[in-house]
Each structure stands twice: as C-alpha cells, then as structure tokens.
Amino acid sequence: MMTSLGNDVLRARLQSGAEVLAPGLDAAQIDRLMDFLALLQKWNRVYNLTALQDPQEMLTQHLLDSLAALAPLRRQLAHLAHLAHSTGLAGPGQGAGPRRLLDVGSGAGLPGVVFAICCPQLDVHCVDSVGKKAAFIGQVALQLRLRNLHGVHARVETLTTPFEIICCRAFAALPDFVRWTRSALRAPDGVWLALKGKHPGAEIAALPADVQVFHVERLTVPGLAAERCIVWLRPAALA
C-alpha cells in the first residue's frame, strides 16, 4: 500500500517526466495516469500483469517509457491530418472522426492506455490473447471513464477492422509483427509503430520487400539508462 508521501513522490516524478516528454498534459491527465498506475499495482497482485512490483520502477519503465513515444505519435497524427486535408480523403478515421490505433499484445495496457489518456482524439483498442489482460483494460476504461479505450480479447491475426496506426511494445520481432497485423492496417496511409530497445538491425534486415522502414527514432526516458527507439514502418507501396 502506497503512503500519501509515496504518492506525492511518484506524482512529482511523473509530472517532471511529463514536462520533458509530453508538454501540455493537464492536471486531469496527470491524475488519470496516476490512477492508472494505482490500478496496475492493484490488479498486478492477482493477475500478474507485469514482472515489476515496485511502483517507482513501474513509473519509469512503464509510464515514462510509454510517454517517451507520445511526441513522435503526435507528429504522426498531425501528418495524417495534413494528408487527409491535402488529399480530400474522408474515409473512416478521417476528417472530424477519431483516429483509430491498435495496441498489439497490449498486456497491462502499455502504451495503449497512456496514449488513450494523453490523446483523446485517438480511439485506442488494446488487443491481447489473454482474457484477464483484456479484462483489465476494460476495467481501466470503466474506472478512468475513458470512452476512447477498449480492451479486445482476440488473436491479432483475426482482426480485420482497419486502423491508421498499429503499435506494439515488447511484442514480437518486426517481421512477425507486420505479418500478423497487415490485414488490420488501413490503406492508404496506415503505419506501424514498434517500440524497441536497441536498434533492431537484424529484424529490419529480415523484413519482407513490401514493407518499408521510413524512420528509426531514438528515445530518451528520464531515469532509464537502457536504449530505446521507435521503428516506423509502412507498406512499401506508400513510399
């Protein structure tokens, strides 16, 4: 059980990290991130959602690690909005409607829950083949009143509903990731976002010819010395 002082320390660390990684978050969003951390600790005792037990480690390695991807995600969303405006596209997720993001192998909801809290314009679906993990996402959406967050109990390769962005974190090698999710990627402007540790050169080399890596972006996570990066991919036909 976290003491009030312990929560104050965690909140201060979260606030400090958010100011660096995700400028512009308001107090309500910080509150929701803290509430998510509390739910993660509570449910983890029963459901074993993460190997981490210490809330300080959860904050750094889960919340801040996910927040590190927020600025790149926002840039991609801005690019999609510009593309839709310049081409006059008005398909699903275009125009005034929300963008659809699929978080694959979401587990404890990372980074999907963080994205849903910080990007209300996103409609986030967290898919996991383990029912209790999908149920946890549903509970988070209910308790935090996140109408843009959905837990999906399914195998990702069975999904065919289109998404503009498909992301993963510690899920699978890049060739498997794109192969299992290709049917759910929306044309013509859909992209994959893979959160990785070290630069995955061997995985990139093993990708099929019809998949293009268009950007590898290094990330810095406050309090974490380990290497982090984002690999952005798209079907090569979009190049």
Curated annotation (Swiss-Prot):
Its main location: cytoplasm. InterPro entries: rRNA_ssu_MeTfrase_G, SAM-dependent_MTases_sf. Specifically methylates the N7 position of guanine in position 527 of 16S rRNA. One of its GO terms (molecular function) is rRNA (guanine-N7-)-methyltransferase activity. Keywords: Cytoplasm, Methyltransferase, rRNA processing, S-adenosyl-L-methionine, Transferase. Its EC number is 2.1.1.170. It is found in: Cytoplasm. It catalyses: guanosine(527) in 16S rRNA + S-adenosyl-L-methionine = N(7)-methylguanosine(527) in 16S rRNA + S-adenosyl-L-homocysteine. Belongs to the methyltransferase superfamily. RNA methyltransferase RsmG family. Coiled coil: none annotated. S-adenosyl-L-methionine binds at G105, L110, V156, E157, R169. The keyword Glycosyltransferase does not apply. GO terms for cellular component: cytosol. This is Ribosomal RNA small subunit methyltransferase G. It is an enzyme of class 2 (transferase). It comes from Verminephrobacter eiseniae (strain EF01-2).
